[in-house]
């Protein structure tokens, strides 16, 4: 059966699920995936804020390279396991916004404000997931977390209460923890299988590229992680 992966990233890790194309069939797998290898810090931009420019750039580069490597290894293991069990992994959804602070600002400006520090770290761990999934040939759909409830209602054709009940029930076989992170990741996976609601809300900019629905430019190129000017 076709399945999709769903992720809700945080600094250094992500909640991950694998979901059947038919949501009534439940969540196949729930796990926490590591997106950072030690010793590089899991919050490299925060750590770099107090360093001189050369040291800051080196730290961010080291942590970025480690994060891309960790994400690639984790997703490869997860996909291999699902495929070995007879599942066809066809897409991935990431519950994360489309910000581009890391691409748009030089490192010194990112490090100058608390808001851009947080934004850059969120984008880093989103980007490594998008890149790792793309490297495995999976089209990726980005789902802004604030839009998860509305998109879930539209996709499933249910009201808020029914959506919450369904998401709770889907996680019941796995037991606790089954948190909002896991539910957001589940919705992201379902939207990866049917991204039309995401495209409709986002407008023409969200139209699928040749690489697949919701893919960001450059995704899947682990040899070229985003670098600051």
State the predicted function of each range.
Residues 201-227:
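Compositionally biased, low-complexity flexible segments
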């Amino acid at each position: 059966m076709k399945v999709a992966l769903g992720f809700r990233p945080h600094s250094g890790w992500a909640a991950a699920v694998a979901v059947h194309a038919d949501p009534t069939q439940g969540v196949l797998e729930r796990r926490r995936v590591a997106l950072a290898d030690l010793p590089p810090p899991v919050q490299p931009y925060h750590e770099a804020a107090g360093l001189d420019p050369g040291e800051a750039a080196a730290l961010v580069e080291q942590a970025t390279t480690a994060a891309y490597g960790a994400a690639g290894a984790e997703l490869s293991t997860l996909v291999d396991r699902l495929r070995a069990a007879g599942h066809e992994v066809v897409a991935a959804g990431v519950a994360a916004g489309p910000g581009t602070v890391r691409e748009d600002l030089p490192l010194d400006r990112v490090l100058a404000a608390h808001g851009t520090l947080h934004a850059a770290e969120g984008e880093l761990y989103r980007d490594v997931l998008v890149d790792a999934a793309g490297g495995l040939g999976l089209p990726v759909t980005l789902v802004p977390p604030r839009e998860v409830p509305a998109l879930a209602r539209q996709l499933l054709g249910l009201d808020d209460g029914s959506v919450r009940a369904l998401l709770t029930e889907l996680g019941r076989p796995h037991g606790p923890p089954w948190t909002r992170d896991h539910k957001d990741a589940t919705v992201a996976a379902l939207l990866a299988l049917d991204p039309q609601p995401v495209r409709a809300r986002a407008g023409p900019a969200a139209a699928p590229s040749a690489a697949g629905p919701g893919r960001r430019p450059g995704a899947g190129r682990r040899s070229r992680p985003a670098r600051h000017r």
